[in-house]
Each structure stands twice: as C-alpha cells, then as structure tokens.
Regions:
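N-terminal, positively charged/glycine-rich alpha-helical extensions of SAM-dependent methyltransferases
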Residues: 1-29
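Conserved alpha-helix/loop element of class I SAM-dependent methyltransferases that forms part
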Residues: 24-57
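Class I SAM-dependent methyltransferase SAM/SAH-binding core
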Residues: 54-114
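Surface-exposed loop/turn positions
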Residues: 57, 121, 151-152
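A short acidic, Gly/Pro-enriched loop at the edge of an enzyme's catalytic core
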Residues: 112-125
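A short SAM/SAH-binding and catalytic strip from SAM-dependent methyltransferases
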Residues: 123-138
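A short glycine-rich, Lys/Arg-flanked "PGG" loop and its adjoining helix->strand segment in the class I
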Residues: 138-153
Length: 153
C-alpha cells in the first residue's frame, strides 16, 4: 500500500511546472519590497492577517519544497525549515537561499512518518496542498500537533 508514496516522490523529483519553479531574483526583490504573499493552494493567497510579525518565529514548511514559500518566509525574517521528501524540490530551496543570501534549513523526510523534530519546535506550520497525496491524515496531523509550540488562548 505504501508504494504510492515512492511513486509520488519520484513524480515530484521529475515534474517541471509552476509548482516547482523557484523564485527568480526579480521575484525575490518584489517579496523584499511588499507584504508577504503566499498561497496554500492554486489561486488562493493566504490572508496577510494570518501572519504575525516575523520576529524570528520558527516556521516549518511541511511538504513545501520548491524554492517559493520558504524563500518568501526567510526574506520576511522567519526561521525557516523546509521538510519535503523530494530531493529536487529541496535543491530548489537551497539554490534560492544560496543565490539570495537566505538561511533555509532543508530536511528530506516523509510526512507520513514521525517528523524528525523535538516536541514543540515550531511556532507555525505552513502546509500547502499536499495532504491530498497521503492516506493517513491522522498521523500527519498528530505529528504536526506534536512539533507545534503550545500557546495559551
């Protein structure tokens, strides 16, 4: 049953479309000048109110490789870690970070398995539409809850 995970990983390692195009230098400069603008899914930008002032907040880009959202978060001052199972997607993040002088941690890992982080590591998890590619959402969300810092409401 887990063969679909390997097939999906192989596909993302070889796909070349808008979801895998890293930010250009010109796009990075636009991000530097404007409020943060990222999408969780095609055509739907995240409301800017969802983002607090960065102040070094730790953000996990879960299945978020590709050199787009992670770069935008790093530009805006977040402490960024990207976790993705696609080596080629992570290479795009590393390429943009190196080219633009950004700090982005990349971790190659499978979101269907225990996350390689301590409890309460991150302030925010940004997970663009990727949960549709896995069978066991409960485990993924359990792991996400485990690595998120607790806050008082």
């Amino acid at each position: 049953m887990k063969d679909y995970i390997k097939l999906n990983e192989d596909r993302w390692n070889h796909v070349n479309n808008d979801y895998t195009e890293p930010l250009t230098h010109e796009e990075v400069e636009e991000v530097r000048k404007n409020p943060i603008s990222v999408a969780l899914t095609v055509g739907k930008k995240v409301p800017i109110e969802w983002f607090e002032k960065a102040n070094g907040k730790k953000i996990l880009g879960l299945a978020c490789g590709g050199g787009q959202q992670g770069s935008a978060f790093a530009i805006k001052g977040y402490d960024v870690t990207i976790m993705d199972f696609s080596a080629s997607q992570l290479q795009r993040d590393e390429m943009v970070a190196e080219r633009e002088g950004l700090k982005i941690n990349t971790i190659q890992a499978d979101m269907t398995k225990p996350f390689p982080f301590e409890d309460e590591t991150f302030d925010i998890i940004f997970n663009p539409v990727s949960n549709v590619y896995i069978e066991d959402l409960e485990n993924m969300y359990r792991e996400a809850a485990r690595v998120l810092k607790r806050v008082e409401c």
